[in-house]
Amino acid sequence: FWAGGSVSFHEKAKDPAKPNEGRKNAYDLAANYNNGPLSLGAGYSYWNSNYQAALRGLYTFGQFTVGAYYQRNKDDNAILGAGAGSRNNFRLSGMYVLNASEFHVNVGRANSWSKVDDSAATQWTLGYNYNLSKRTKVYTYYTKVNNGKNASYGYATKAENNNVIRANGLNTSSFALGVRHNF
C-alpha cells in the first residue's frame, strides 16, 4: 500500500481585469494497494472548485487480466468560463497472454458534460504485443475515437498562436507499430 499527496501553490495567475480574485492552490491525493493478482487505486484532485475523483482496479487470473476505471469530474470554471458542469467517465480493459504474445482490448467513455450537450466521446482500442525478451517488445494497435458534435478528443486540426485547436465533432482513428525497450 502507498499513498501520496501534493499541494501546488498559486496555480492560477492573477488576472489584471479581476483584481479581487486571488490565486488558488491545487491539491492532489492518491492511494494504491497491490496484493498478488489484485491492484486497486483511488485519486482525487481539487483546484478552484473544480475536482476529479477516480477509482481503478486490475485483476489477473491465469492468462487473463481485466481492468476498470471510473472517474467523476466537476468543472465550475476551468473549461468554460461559466463551467461545463459535471460528468462521469469509465474505461474497461482486457488482456490475454499466450506465450510471448499479448492481445489487448479496451473501451473508454467520457460522458457528456451536464452543461454542454452532445459532448461525449467513446474510444475503442485493439492491440497486440510480442515480447522479444523481458525488456523488449514489438507492438501494434488500432484506436478509434467517436466524438459527439461538441466533443474534441483526439488530434489537433491546427495550431494558432502556439495554441492547439481541435475541431468539435470530428472522429479520429490511428494505427501504430513500434518497438519498446526498457533500459
State where each predicted segment sits.
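Aromatic- and glycine-enriched pocket-lining scaffold segments that form the walls
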Residues: 1-32
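Outer-envelope exported proteins of Gram-negative bacteria
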Residues: 4-6, 106, 139-141, 178
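Outer-membrane beta-barrel and related beta-rich outer-membrane complex signature
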Residues: 17, 80, 117, 150-158
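Extended amphipathic alpha-helical coiled-coil/heptad-repeat regions
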Residues: 141, 150-156, 166-168
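Outer-membrane beta-barrel "beta-signal"
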Residues: 167-183
